[in-house]
Amino acid sequence: MKKRKASLSLLMFTACVSPFSVLAENAIETPQQLKEVVITTTRIPELKTNAAATVTVIDQKQIAEMSKIAPDLSHLLGLVTPGMALASNTTSSRTQSLRGRSALILIDGIPQSTPLRSTDRDMRTIDVSAIDHIEIVKGSTALYGNGAIGGLINIITKKNASHTIVSGQTTLAGSTYDFFRKGKGQGYRINQQLYGNTGNLDYLVSGTFGRTGSSIDGDGEFISPRYGLGDTYTTNTLVKLGYAFSEKSRLEFMYNFYRSLQDTKLIPQGGKYMREPAIGVIGNKDPQAVEEGTRYNHNAYLKFTSRDLFRNTNFEASLYGSSLYTIFDFRKANPKSPRWEETSGQSSIKDKKWGFRTQFTSRLTLSDDVSAHVVYGYDYLLNKTAQPLVDGRYWVPFLTSYNHAPFVQVKASIWQWLNVKLGGRYDIINVDVPDYNVLRNKLKDPQVAVKGGDLKYNNMSFNVGLSYNKYRVFQPFVAFSQGFSIFDLGRTLRAAKADVLSKISTEPVKTNNYEVGAYSEVGNWLQLNGSFFYTYSKLGSDLKIENGFWVVNRTPQKVYGMELNADVKILENLKAGANISWFEGKIKTETGKWDSYMSNISIPAAKLAMYINYVPVKNTYLNLQYIHTGKRDRFAPDAKGVYNEGEGVVNRINLVNLNAGIKLKAWDLGLSVSNLLNNTYYTSTSMLMARNAEFARADGRNITFTATFKY
């Protein structure tokens, strides 16, 4: 214990101060190059170090390398994002909050999160092959409206990078667990991209098809297929077209299609919490069951941009839409825990969005020492969401929200090194709830017929930040921001016990986020950064279990913690780094004291990540990554020794990944090994859920060979 504390103290001292990319972005990149990262998710294009916020940027090179280890986006984000838990090794990302609260997931600014009824699939809405880079802004924010009480994750799709009429690349990948069971563990991926430009027109077309093998743990046992990622086939198509009317104006169209469904011969078996894992065995599914997964996720936008539309003012307008249909696992009727009027069934979520954004950015020069950018505009979003069963019954009826929001954001630069940010957004949301009957659990339960109506939400959110960048060795920032969320409204309505909408607790969650941090560069060999944060909400968003079902805990909550990072260039061809993130969440009880903890669903154990990036010779790379998550033991079992869901003990995890590659002219060859040491362990999610059926292990050693040919 003393050695562990000493090591942690040394890391905190040397790292001293924010976000960190677990894997080196490029072994020959210098800290100066890393500093010049421009982000756009804050709605004002700016350097990451000037954003007065903790920002993680995962660039295209890093995505290309990490996706060989983690082709599933939720897995990739869990490995490289401080403040986020490791992935669950399932299709669900429920336990992957951002700093203990829900994040708003965007694809090119199009919301993927479904606040009217959460899918917990927000991070599995696009394939990594279509992604150029990812911008993660941490802390509560209302820059894009409802849902970002933990932060924003904006996934930016690829675009043409060629100056020829036709260029392209073909990628083939194969993976295997075959050290254990031949014929069952193989997977493959194929990606084809074509891109180029001719005259004023540029384009990119990308298509991906992949299939994973059966998931196998470190002992060679098939992992339970419940919500599993094994035996899934994935399809993704991205089309992007751009036309430049002039050097200053451009029209761009994007369309992305994503599908991921499970097709397995395995069925779940066994599972005893903290005793034996839930496994997969070959068997026959219930004939009523259909393939689980995301049948489709369509996203599209049409965007017009104009620089200097009028004096010193840029303009951007976009129309966008999305359509999602995802199906959950089949649940056989269980007399001990009945649902859906004591019948079997399979629920799904259907979600549609249409919206537009208009934004003006004006540049002001007030004096030789003072300049400013003023961003102002208007957002509109129409969102329809329902949770039907595949047999046609509705668990949650179609809810329709209408969201209008004017906003303004000002960033002033004083003496070129003092940056002041101030902004506000006023959201007007009307949710139309139809008359509906609550789908009872038991036939003998009283039928509740809810009289529908309109739920109205008006919310004003502010943000203010200050950053100081005169000295590279110490670039501090301080920030305050607010966010709000209509947190999983459908979950509340489907369990309604009152017949009048006004009697049902549907208040939104509002958060205040305070943060202080700094970026630092020492010479051209050392980067340090870090932040400390505190978030408070009068109404909570943590989930708790009541009568076998999840409900929202509305008691006040606070989350506080820190992120620390250090990157060091040891030699020109050798780089290393480490990152630690830790935070805690408390609930204010009826006693008026903060003497209860938020569940493990929201608050993960501390996470430490370290890497070494080595370039043996030119055009090669060797990356070794180590991940450690700590223990979280905050809750006691009941008299029978049973934990509430979400309150199970989370034990430590140690994980090592290897990534190596070589470039030979037009070829890029790679070898990746996830779980290099073939560690047999349970996922954090399986431990915290504390339920037999979900007590499943993580994947064992998996080897992937990748070949990319560019032309």
For the regions a language model picked out, list residue spans one by one.
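Extracytoplasmic beta-strand/coil segments of soluble accessory domains associated
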Residues: 74-114
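A beta-strand signature from Gram-negative outer-membrane beta-barrel systems
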Residues: 128-167, 710
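Membrane-embedded beta-barrel scaffold of Gram-negative outer-membrane proteins
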Residues: 312-333, 467-487, 505-560, 565-569, ...
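Flexible loop and strand-edge segments within Gram-negative outer membrane beta-barrel domains
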Residues: 212-216, 224, 228-234, 248-311, ...
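Transmembrane beta-barrel wall of Gram-negative outer-membrane proteins
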Residues: 182-213, 217-265, 298, 362, ...
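Gram-negative outer-membrane beta-barrel transporters
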Residues: 169, 416, 529-537, 553-639, ...
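C-terminal beta-signal and adjacent terminal beta-strands/loops
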Residues: 215, 484, 576, 618, ...
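Short acidic/polar hinge/loop motifs at secondary-structure boundaries
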Residues: 110-138, 192
